[in-house]
């Protein structure tokens, strides 16, 4: 066996047990994505990336996502390995294979294979947390005081930009991801993360599980959880394989798990139906939760929609590119039908030049390196059109000096379509303008930020999708200067300006709403990676420097739903420690019941496209998680960690973690007098006792809870 085969066999593959959830698939008559056609015909294409144009030849290795019949993925992966290619089977219906386009027809000919798709690129969703959510430092004498710290729970973080040696992660890991493109694990930390551009992963992982570092107050939510860091190139093929690896490892250890996904994109149907979303959904299970960032497109005009009232009606969507941020004039946009079926829409890319619409031919688009797909998706039976490329090159091939991109969509009565601009790759906006065509005036719609659920993470049907609000808008840097980000993030306590809005276009009644919940994501201080390409010791965002082992390490400010998501991930880790059998539906029910409402969310909020169910509350959610715990699970009579305390200004709440024979709760004044006493007979897990502190005189007290096995004593300050 040659080295290539040895490598493939080494990477090989785990295959998840067959899931009860079968991938929804429609036979459209095609066995592969139409974007492969040019390659299969022997032509090279140009792919849009953040680094610029990338030429792809028929022999360039691609990350392929191969959908199979139930139970067929492992067989297909083994076949690819035998042919000398790298392959994995993250689920029983998906094989991810690294191979050139020339291998696609060979794969498609196999009886197990339903469809060969391309991998999509995802992006980090980055654009004072603990107190705000009810998780705070006990030493401050306020907030949540609980024995639950995530111990026994695996927190997987799939991301880019880990500084593995940061003291925030000291003794936090037993395994590490060893490849940015697969689910391989290793027993030691990699030397560095090849995709560390901004230190994103370091910031994110510390929010979720960062350890306490001497001299630093910026530690994580679940400080006892086990971190499994998976450095990733964030292609959908990679993230699926890495999520499956986290699940396999945690379940092999007999531990519940939660995966943080602070990434996404504005590609796809935004309905949770893609092969990525459906197969990620298969991983979700009892004691296994996926958490995804909504995205940072809330302030962008990246979405438009149109409902057709008569056959033959036309709609036009005009894209105004940002000349300063999009100097290469990249267009990356999609139009999707909201209705199942073929022939409801005719989708055409066009160029508006000197008041006329010009339609590029396939020859012109190919010559300019553009990619245009127009087909019916086999995963939701909906038509779509997708255009990507460098627009100025297209103008040249069309013989035009000037022009702007326009979608032309013709529909049948009752049809509805949505269009999105992928602003991660193509800065711009859908803009309002007037078009006069054949003596008829059309007004193109101005874009909005609706229906912008991040693809590949928040869009997964069972994912807990997270919006961002602001717990802070300013900070003081290492230099001692104060800075305000209010113009960017918005007002304190309000939804962050950048936080992407829902809802999803899903028609699946079992899919969770997007967003599901909101957490602090604006101006969050967490660990920085000094190995990031963008890092500077003089950066304004640096807030604190600590020294560990003679080496300096840093903490600083980032904002985004990327930062809000690990807050929720860490809190769910606490809940999983208390109740390791929680499902995603259980977590969603807890969030729906316990989310905080205020004047910003609306006090009568049930759900909204901005907030989901409201602001996450760690304590109230923990109470519900304990109450939902089935008999016989993690219940210890007369335990040594009997209670969780929620310390408020007006009252202290005593939550019983387990069943106890009895409990005595006392508040003792400095002079030794008992100011409050309550005997509780046989409290059960999830029971709560509220001690009103407003009846106490200002001063320092001892708060004491005694049970058969232990006594918990805390200092109480009443002002």
Residue spans of the language-model regions?
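Autoinhibitory N-terminal propeptides
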Residues: 5-12, 18-145, 152-155
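C-terminal tail/sorting-segment detector
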Residues: 20, 654, 677, 698-719
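C-terminal subdomain of the subtilisin-like protease fold in secreted/lumenal serine endopeptidases
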Residues: 53-55, 252-265, 269, 283, ...
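Subtilisin-like serine protease catalytic core
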Residues: 142-239, 254-257, 272, 285-289, ...
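Active-site core segment of subtilase-fold serine proteases
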Residues: 146-149, 160-202, 206, 253, ...
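Catalytic-core environment of secreted peptidases
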Residues: 174, 182-186, 352-353, 371, ...
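Hydrolase catalytic cores
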Residues: 205-208, 228-235, 247-255, 332-350, ...
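Glycine-centered tight-turn motifs at strand-turn-strand junctions
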Residues: 650, 674-695, 709-712
């Amino acid at each position: 066996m040659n080295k290539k085969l040895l490598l493939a066999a080494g990477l090989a593959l785990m295959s998840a047990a067959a899931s009860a959830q079968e991938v929804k698939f429609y036979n459209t008559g095609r066995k592969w994505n139409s974007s492969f056609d040019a390659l299969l015909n022997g032509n090279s294409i140009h792919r849009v990336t953040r680094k610029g144009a990338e030429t792809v030849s028929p022999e360039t290795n691609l990350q392929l996502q191969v959908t199979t019949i139930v139970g067929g993925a492992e067989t297909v992966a083994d076949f690819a390995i035998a042919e000398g290619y790298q392959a994995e089977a993250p689920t029983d219906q998906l094989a991810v294979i690294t191979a050139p386009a020339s291998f696609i027809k060979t794969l498609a000919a196999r009886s197990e294979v339903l469809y060969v798709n391309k991998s999509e690129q995802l992006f980090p969703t980055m654009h004072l947390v603990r107190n705000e959510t009810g998780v705070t430092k006990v030493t401050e004498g306020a907030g949540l005081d609980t024995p639950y710290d995530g111990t026994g729970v695996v927190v997987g973080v799939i991301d880019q930009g880990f500084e593995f040696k940061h003291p925030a992660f000291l003794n936090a890991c037993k395994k590490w991801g060893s490849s940015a493109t697969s689910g391989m694990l290793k027993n030691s930390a990699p030397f560095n993360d090849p995709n560390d551009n901004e230190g994103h992963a370091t910031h994110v992982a510390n929010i979720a599980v960062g350890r306490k570092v001497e001299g630093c107050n910026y530690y994580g939510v679940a400080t006892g959880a086990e971190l499994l860091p998976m450095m990733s190139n964030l292609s959908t093929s990679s993230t699926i394989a890495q999520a499956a690896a986290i699940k396999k490892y945690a379940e092999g250890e007999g531990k519940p798990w939660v995966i943080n996904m602070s990434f996404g994109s504005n590609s796809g149907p935004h309905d949770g139906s893609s092969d990525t979303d459906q197969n990620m959904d298969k991983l979700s299970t009892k004691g296994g939760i996926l958490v995804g960032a909504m995205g940072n497109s809330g302030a962008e005009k990246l979405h438009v929609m149109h409902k057709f009232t008569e056959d033959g009606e036309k709609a036009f969507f005009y894209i105004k590119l940002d000349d300063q941020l999009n100097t290469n004039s990249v267009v990356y946009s999609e139009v999707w039908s909201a209705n199942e079926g073929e022939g409801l829409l005719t989708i055409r890319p066009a160029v508006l030049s000197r008041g006329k619409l010009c339609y590029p031919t396939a020859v012109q688009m190919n010559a300019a390196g553009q990619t245009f797909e127009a087909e019916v998706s086999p995963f939701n039976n909906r038509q779509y059109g997708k255009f990507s490329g460098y627009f100025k090159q297209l103008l040249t091939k069309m013989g035009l000096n000037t022009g702007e991109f326009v979608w032309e969509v013709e529909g049948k009565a009752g049809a509805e379509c949505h269009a999105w601009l992928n602003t991660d790759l193509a800065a711009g906006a859908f803009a309002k303008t007037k078009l006069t065509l054949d003596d008829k005036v059309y007004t193109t719609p101005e874009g909005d930020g609706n229906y912008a659920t991040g693809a590949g993470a928040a869009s997964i049907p069972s994912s807990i999708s997270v919006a961002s609000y602001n717990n802070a808008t300013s900070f003081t840097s290492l230099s001692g200067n104060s800075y305000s980000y209010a113009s960017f993030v918005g007002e304190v306590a309000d939804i962050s300006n950048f936080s992407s809005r829902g809802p999803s276009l899903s028609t699946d009644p079992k899919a969770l709403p997007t967003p599901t919940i909101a957490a602090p994501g604006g101006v969050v201080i967490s660990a920085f990676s000094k190995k990031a390409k963008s890092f500077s010791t003089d950066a304004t965002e640096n807030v604190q420097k600590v020294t560990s082992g003679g080496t300096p390490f840093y903490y600083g400010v980032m904002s985004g739903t990327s930062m809000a998501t690990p807050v929720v991930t860490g809190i769910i880790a606490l809940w999983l420690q208390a109740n390791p059998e929680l499902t995603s539906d259980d977590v969603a029910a807890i969030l729906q019941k316990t989310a905080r409402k205020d004047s910003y969310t609306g006090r009568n909020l049930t759900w909204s496209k901005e907030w989901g169910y409201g602001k996450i509350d760690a304590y109230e959610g923990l109470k519900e998680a304990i109450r939902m715990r089935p008999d016989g699970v993690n219940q210890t009579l007369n335990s040594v960690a009997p209670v969780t305390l929620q310390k408020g200004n007006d009252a202290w709440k005593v939550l019983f973690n387990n069943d106890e024979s009895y409990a005595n709760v006392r508040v003792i004044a400095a002079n030794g007098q008992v100011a409050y006493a309550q005997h509780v007979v046989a409290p059960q897990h999830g029971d709560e006792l509220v001690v009103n502190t407003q009846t106490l005189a200002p001063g320092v007290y001892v708060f004491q809870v005694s049970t058969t096995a232990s006594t918990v004593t805390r200092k109480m300050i009443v002002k």
